[in-house]
């Protein structure tokens, strides 16, 4: 697939045809969810945030809107939608959820479910001053180009762990966020 020519229809048909295989086994029992917001355009965008430098965990990192599932959430999808509204003012009613990717175990002890949703192009994003320092949109075709991600093998607590690294403009995209974007690319059939 030529990544420069990815349309929203191409993305949707590939995502719907190749449904993710969900592995129910997990090392972590605390649940979290992130929204992967795909901006509805002829050439779609991928909405990302940069976390505030004042946060205790993952300060300054590029991330999808999301967080822990709490007692008021009916599901991981509800948690992702709630967090997106809290962090960047995306109303849950504006998100067309098209599916989820397999959960990812985080280094902070959460099982994170990526929820894929389509959002309108004209939403007035407002970053939560406490949690988000920037909101930006990356062309989806560029985000899903696997050649932009570089592996780094690190050792943590005696175990080898692979993280993925990339840049977009002034933003350093790495770790779980880069891994989720790569998983989305693989899910729609992009070849390494």
Swiss-Prot record:
Keyword terms: Hydrolase, Magnesium, Manganese, Metal-binding
Residues in Nudix hydrolase domain copies: 29-160
GO BP, one annotated term: nucleoside diphosphate metabolic process
Gene3D superfamilies (alphabetical): Nucleoside Triphosphate Pyrophosphohydrolase (3.90.79.10)
CDD domains named among the record's database cross-references: NUDIX_CoAse_Nudt7
Matching PROSITE patterns: NUDIX, NUDIX_COA
Enzyme class: hydrolase
Enzyme Commission number(s) from the entry: 3.6.1.-
Matching SUPFAM superfamilies: Nudix (SSF55811)
Renumbered ranges of motif Nudix box: 67-89
Xref: InterPro entries: CoAse, NUDIX_hydrolase-like_dom_sf, NUDIX_hydrolase_dom, NUDIX_hydrolase_NudL_CS, Nudix_NudL
Superkingdom of source: Bacteria
Chain sites annotated for binding Mg(2+): 83, 87
Cofactor: Mn(2+); Mg(2+)
Alphabetized GO MF terms: coenzyme A diphosphatase activity; magnesium ion binding; manganese ion binding
Pfam family, one: NUDIX
Family: Belongs to the Nudix hydrolase family. PCD1 subfamily.
Function in brief: Probably mediates the hydrolysis of some nucleoside diphosphate derivatives.
Protein name: Uncharacterized Nudix hydrolase NudL
The organism's taxonomic lineage, starting at the top: Bacteria, Pseudomonadati, Pseudomonadota, Gammaproteobacteria, Enterobacterales
């Amino acid at each position: 697939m030529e990544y420069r020519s990815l349309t929203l229809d191409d993305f949707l048909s590939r995502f719907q045809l190749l449904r993710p295989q969900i592995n129910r086994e997990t090392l972590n029992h605390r649940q979290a969810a992130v929204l992967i917001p795909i901006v509805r355009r002829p050439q779609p965008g991928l909405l990302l945030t940069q976390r505030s430098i004042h946060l205790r965990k993952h300060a300054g990192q590029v991330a999808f809107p999301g967080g822990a599932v709490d007692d008021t959430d009916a599901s991981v999808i509800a948690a992702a939608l709630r967090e997106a509204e809290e962090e960047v003012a995306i109303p849950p009613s504006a998100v067309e959820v098209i599916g989820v990717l397999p959960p990812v175990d985080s280094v902070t002890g959460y099982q994170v479910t990526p929820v894929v949703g389509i959002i309108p192009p004209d939403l007035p994003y407002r970053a939560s001053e406490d949690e988000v320092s920037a909101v930006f949109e990356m062309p989806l075709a560029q985000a899903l180009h696997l050649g932009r991600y570089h592996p780094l093998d690190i050792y943590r607590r005696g175990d080898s762990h692979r993280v993925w690294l990339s840049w977009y403009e002034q933003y350093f995209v790495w770790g779980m966020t880069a891994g989720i974007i790569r998983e989305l690319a693989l899910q729609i059939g992009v070849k390494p």
